[in-house]
A protein has these predicted regions:
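Structural signal for interior beta-strand "rungs" in well-ordered beta-sheet cores
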Residues: 3-146
Length: 146
């Protein structure tokens, strides 16, 4: 059973898994998938094109699936895929891909501390830790365990 605050905005087209908690003032657009057992804290924005696996915790003021900060972006439908059991702390921004043929990808069991920014078309593997305020430019690959 889900626990979705009536003060959260969840587009009726969004696909929400089982046992998901969404706190007040979260904003979730229609082309979004949230897997089972996720927790979405207050003031999180999850934008179109974002896919969250299961067991993720997304903390306050985070923006997932923001448009890429790239002059080459022309408004194509692009994606951000996030795996399972990630901890995404406060004020994190993760951008979607620049082109429809690419994607931004975050693997499993990563820990993104406060203020991290992961730019467009980046591929983060599994078990990575990003310290406070880390900024990753677009088109990067971060291997497991970094």
């Amino acid at each position: 059973m889900n626990n979705i605050s009536p003060q959260a905005y969840v587009d009726p087209k969004a696909k929400i898994g089982n046992n998901v908690t969404i706190y007040p003032f979260a904003y979730i657009e229609g082309d979004v998938e949230i897997g089972d057992d996720c927790v979405i804290y207050p003031y999180v924005s999850i934008m179109n094109g974002t896919r969250l696996g299961r067991g993720n915790k997304v903390y306050q003021n985070t923006v997932l699936g923001a448009e890429p900060q790239d002059f080459n972006y022309k408004g194509e439908i692009t994606t951000l895929e996030i795996g399972d059991e990630n901890i995404i702390r406060e004020n994190v921004v993760i951008n979607r891909a620049t082109y429809a043929t690419g994607k931004t990808h975050i693997g499993n069991r990563n820990f993104l501390m406060e203020g991290v920014h992961i730019s467009h078309d980046t591929d983060v593997h599994d078990y990575c830790v990003f310290g406070y305020g880390t900024k990753i430019a677009g088109d990067c690959e971060i291997h497991s365990g970094i």
